[in-house]
Amino acid sequence: MALRTRLGELLRPLNSEYGKVAPGWGTTPAMGFVMLLFFLFLLIILQIYNSSLILENVDVDWASLGN
């Protein structure tokens, strides 16, 4: 038999929808939008590191991080 705790009783409503699937697309468009924003963030970071995107007073040098 499982141990019943106060925390378990508080969290039980969160697990009551187990196995059910939201109808339609659900939150898929929101997830896609967040993935797109994350991709753009990574792309900008890569361009800064590769010096493809030139920003004034931004040195891409490990030695400059210690100053």
Swiss-Prot record:
Its main location: plastid. The chain crosses the membrane at residues 29-49. Disulfide bonds: none annotated. Keywords: Chloroplast, Membrane, Photosynthesis, Photosystem II, Plastid, Thylakoid, Transmembrane, Transmembrane helix. It is a single-pass membrane protein. GO terms for molecular function: phosphate ion binding. GO terms for cellular component: chloroplast thylakoid membrane; photosystem II. GO terms for biological process: photosynthesis; protein stabilization. It is found in: Plastid, Chloroplast thylakoid membrane. One of the components of the core complex of photosystem II (PSII), required for its stability and/or assembly. PSII is a light-driven water:plastoquinone oxidoreductase that uses light energy to abstract electrons from H(2)O, generating O(2) and a proton gradient subsequently used for ATP formation. It consists of a core antenna complex that captures photons, and an electron transfer chain that converts photonic excitation into a charge separation. PSII is composed of 1 copy each of membrane proteins PsbA, PsbB, PsbC, PsbD, PsbE, PsbF, PsbH, PsbI, PsbJ, PsbK, PsbL, PsbM, PsbT, PsbX, PsbY, PsbZ, Psb30/Ycf12, at least 3 peripheral proteins of the oxygen-evolving complex and a large number of cofactors. It forms dimeric complexes. Belongs to the PsbH family. This is Photosystem II reaction center protein H. It comes from Guillardia theta (Cryptophyte). The gene is psbH.
